[in-house]
Curated annotation (Swiss-Prot):
Protein purpose: Catalyzes the formation of dTDP-glucose, from dTTP and glucose 1-phosphate, as well as its pyrophosphorolysis.
Protein name: Glucose-1-phosphate thymidylyltransferase
GO biological process, one term: dTDP-rhamnose biosynthetic process
Assembly notes: Homotetramer.
Name of the coding gene: rmlA
């Protein structure tokens, strides 16, 4: 089976969140008890992906390096690349071409939070897919804000539109995408900038769809997909995570726990990671976890 590498796109200027993001990347803001980027990072880890490229702005990349390092503390291999200007999501495959090499890849947006008991199982089918692409559809109340997928009676995707004025369905394409290695060449050779001057991920997905190689996995009831691009959605996401964690006593998107439970690191390493955090609830949670309660 081919290796699958991951990319987190954590660029952009975050203008919708000004003044909060005037001096700091949106993806470094807290979502309850963790930096935002922990959530998409955890999503890739839950898919079993350990080689991950983080793409950000020239000014923010050093901050991500300071926060996450080379990933070895979690049994990961993290690398970094700069996106000089926000020229579209699909530019990630051009920037990450050397990193991807001959492997398949997954892309997750740095401000997207995914939650659901069966999320690892849902991603497993996408990870194991030999060729083509998989995107994830989620029923939303305001589809005009997103890329929208339309289905026929058999559940096959028949159209994809970016932020349509008159959406043909309520199913938005989320910020999590799995592709075979063809995506690099598609991004480099087949894409032209859209009317807004960007290389659109929707155009990539449309090429796969027209080739009959696009799978759409449904995130149904019981899943949460949170897009944290506004002041209101930031606090809603924090409240959502807080409610689950306080009720269950279990953490959501805790990289240390995921790394431990997936066998990327051992209990001794968890202890090392918990040591500087032991005076707060996060560190105490890690120590309790390795004691088995």
């Amino acid at each position: 089976m081919k290796t699958r590498k991951g990319i987190i796109l954590a660029g952009g200027s975050g203008t919708r969140l000004y003044p909060v993001t005037m001096a700091v990347s949106k993806q470094l803001l807290p979502i309850y008890d963790k930096p935002m980027i922990y959530y998409p990072l955890s999503t890739l880890m839950l898919a079993g992906i350990r080689d991950i490229l983080i793409i950000s702005t020239p000014q923010d990349t050093p901050r991500f390096q300071q926060l996450l390092g080379d990933g070895s503390q979690w049994g990961l291999n993290l690398q970094y690349k700069v996106q000089p200007s926000p020229d579209g999501l699909a530019q990630a495959f051009i920037i990450g071409e050397d990193f991807i090499g001959g492997d398949d890849c997954a892309l997750v947006l740095g401000d997207n939070i995914f939650y659901g008991h069966d999320l690892p199982k849902l991603m497993e089918a996408a990870v194991n897919k030999e060729s083509g692409a998989t995107v994830f559809a989620y029923h939303v109340n305001d589809p005009e804000r997103y890329g929208v997928v339309e289905f026929d009676n058999n559940g096959t995707a028949i159209s994809l539109e970016e932020k349509p004025l008159e959406p043909k369905s309520n199913y938005a394409v989320t910020g999590l995408y799995f592709y075979d290695n063809d995506v690099v060449e598609m991004a480099r050779k087949n894409l032209k900038p859209s009317a807004r001057g960007e290389l659109e991920i929707t155009d990539i997905n449309r090429i796969y769809m027209e080739q009959g190689r696009l799978s759409v996995a449904m995130m149904g009831r019981g899943y949460a997909w949170l897009d944290t691009g506004t002041h209101q959605s930031l606090i809603e996401a924090s409240n959502f995570i807080a409610t689950i964690e306080e009720r269950q006593g279990l953490k959501v998107s805790c990289p240390e726990e995921i790394a431990y439970r997936k066998g990327f690191i051992d209990a001794e390493q968890v202890k090392v990671l918990a040591e500087p955090l032991k005076k707060n609830a996060y560190g105490q949670y890690l120590l309790k976890m390795i004691k088995g309660y």
